């Protein structure tokens, strides 16, 4: 019965309902395809006829898939791309300009700093208040070393280099200036002990010459007086021999001792050894 009803339902025209039989009617399903005849070569689904289901989302056709790539939207995307490129170009130009401005500012700041530093250096070099250094000679004197002692010929004692007495007469070549010296020659100061040493040396050299000259004068005067004294002694002894011959006290030695011989005179006047001049005198 069911198969017969199915066949009757298939033979009905499309859109028509089956006649009621046996107290009930059969209705075709809306989702089932229309089948006109059953055969082995017949296609169950026909591709030419497409029907959509009710109460369901609409299915887009193949033509609807190409809607995004419509010729209306292509120029809009191109315009957007052109605008974006122009914006990028503007951004690049702005960044390049900003970089150039920053480089120029940095260069100007560096120039200002260098000029300010050079001005500060010039002010430091020109102002005497900021120069507080002691000039040091390239070849320092051994008598002016730190912690050394110097022998002062004027004071006749050892004097430390830090406690040197100030010179009463200032040196004309030594200048007490606080300016920065431009040549190393100004840094070399003459030694304070130089003229004192030379003065002492000249005094020591001149003193023995004076002593020697004085001794030669004394010797020459004594040598000139000795022949006169010898002549007086010989005349005196001859007179004594004539007046009192054979006397024991008339010997030339005793007479020379009593009357004052030139030997005693030379002993009292000169520091040299006495010379016996009576041995050279002729004895009568």
Curated annotation (Swiss-Prot):
Chief location: nucleus
Domain of life, source organism: Eukaryota
Subcellular location: Nucleus; Cytoplasm
Matching InterPro entries: PBIR1/2/3 (IPR026716)
GO biological processes: mitotic G2/M transition checkpoint; positive regulation of cell growth; positive regulation of proteasomal ubiquitin-dependent protein catabolic process
Compositionally biased spans, kind Low complexity: 152-164, 172-184
Keyword Signal attributed: no
Keyword match Cytoplasm: yes
Record field: compositional bias (Polar residues): 258-269
GO molecular function, one term: protein serine/threonine phosphatase inhibitor activity
Keywords: Cytoplasm, Nucleus, Protein phosphatase inhibitor
Region annotation (Disordered) ranges: 1-32, 112-198, 235-284
Function: Acts as an inhibitor of serine/threonine-protein phosphatase 2A (PP2A) activity. Potentiates ubiquitin-mediated proteasomal degradation of serine/threonine-protein phosphatase 2A catalytic subunit alpha (PPP2CA). Inhibits PP2A-mediated dephosphorylation of WEE1, promoting ubiquitin-mediated proteolysis of WEE1, thereby releasing G2/M checkpoint.
Family: Belongs to the FAM122 family.
Entry protein name: P2R1A-PPP2R2A-interacting phosphatase regulator 1
Organism per entry: Gallus gallus (Chicken)
């Amino acid at each position: 019965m069911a198969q017969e009803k199915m066949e009757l339902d298939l033979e009905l025209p499309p859109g028509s309902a089956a006649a009621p039989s046996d107290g009930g009617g059969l209705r075709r399903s809306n989702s089932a395809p229309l089948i006109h005849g059953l055969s082995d070569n017949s296609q169950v689904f026909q591709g030419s006829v497409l029907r959509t289901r009710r109460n369901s989302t609409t299915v887009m056709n193949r033509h609807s898939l190409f809607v995004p790539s419509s010729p209306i939207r292509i120029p809009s995307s191109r315009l957007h791309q052109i605008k974006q490129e122009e914006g990028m170009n503007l951004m690049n130009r702005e960044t390049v300009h900003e970089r150039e401005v920053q480089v120029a500012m940095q260069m100007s700041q560096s120039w200002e700093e260098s000029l300010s530093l050079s001005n500060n250096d010039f002010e430091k070099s020109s102002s005497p208040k900021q120069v507080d250094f002691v000039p040091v000679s390239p070849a320092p004197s051994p008598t002016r070393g730190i912690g050394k002692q110097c022998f002062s010929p004027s004071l006749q004692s050892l004097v430390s280099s830090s406690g040197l007495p100030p010179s009463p007469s200032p040196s004309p070549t030594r200048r007490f200036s606080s300016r920065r010296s431009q040549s190393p020659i100004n840094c070399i100061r003459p030694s304070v002990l130089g003229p004192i040493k030379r003065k002492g040396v000249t005094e020591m050299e001149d003193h023995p010459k004076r002593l020697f000259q004085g001794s030669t004068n004394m010797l020459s005067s004594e040598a000139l007086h000795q022949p006169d004294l010898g002549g007086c002694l010989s005349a005196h002894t001859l007179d004594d021999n004539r007046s009192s011959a054979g006397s024991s006290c008339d010997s030339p030695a005793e007479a020379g001792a009593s009357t004052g011989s030139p030997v005693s005179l030379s002993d009292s006047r000169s520091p040299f050894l006495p010379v016996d001049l009576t041995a050279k005198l002729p004895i009568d």
